[in-house]
């Protein structure tokens, strides 16, 4: 069976008085040794550090003991007063008569109102402190509000400037995604050669205009005339025109062509015959 908790305020007060009445001896005088050898020098160097532990720590120990004794006296006083108040409260609820019992019940009913008053006091203090704090912060809030109002248009303008950029980025991303899904993009541009202009490289080889064909037709009859002239110069007198050559060899007709030399280029039949009249 556990023993009931009991505190003896009288014994506690007596122990506190005894602790406070302790008398500590006076610390000895510093030790100093005369001499010049190494032992004397070592003693004079070591002893001050040992003596300082006592001389410096003793006042702190005395102060701690005095404080402990004072706390013990205060605790004994609290225990004594608490015991007295509890005895007085219990004596009010003694059931010696019916009137005393009813009075005790009435007193019990009145305790909640007292407790309410005790609880309401700290709450009112907290409310007052909150009101004072709010009053102190009010000027700062009022000072910050105009700054926020001035910064609001800048924030709206920044958001408006940022929206086109976001749209451009989204469009670029969509185009890149479509190109990736298509699998093939446009052919890359080729660099033009440094030796030929780009116009000559772009022109196909197989394309020949009608003007070029006409030029070729004009050149071929000139070559034929030159070859015939060379043959006439190297032939015998009997074979030159008018020198015994048969008439049918001279007169080939108005629309006939002169005989072509074996060295001359072949003549296209579809090409019209040019005039053979030359000026010497």
Curated annotation (Swiss-Prot):
It is found in: Secreted. It comes from the Bacteria. The keyword Lyase does not apply. Phosphorylated at Ser-70. Residues 167-280 are annotated as: Disordered. Residues 167-181, 246-280 have a biased composition (Low complexity). Keywords: Phosphoprotein, Secreted, Virulence. Its main location: secreted. The modification Phosphoserine is found at residue 70. GO terms for cellular component: extracellular region. This is ESX-1 secretion-associated protein EspJ. It comes from Mycobacterium tuberculosis (strain CDC 1551 / Oshkosh).
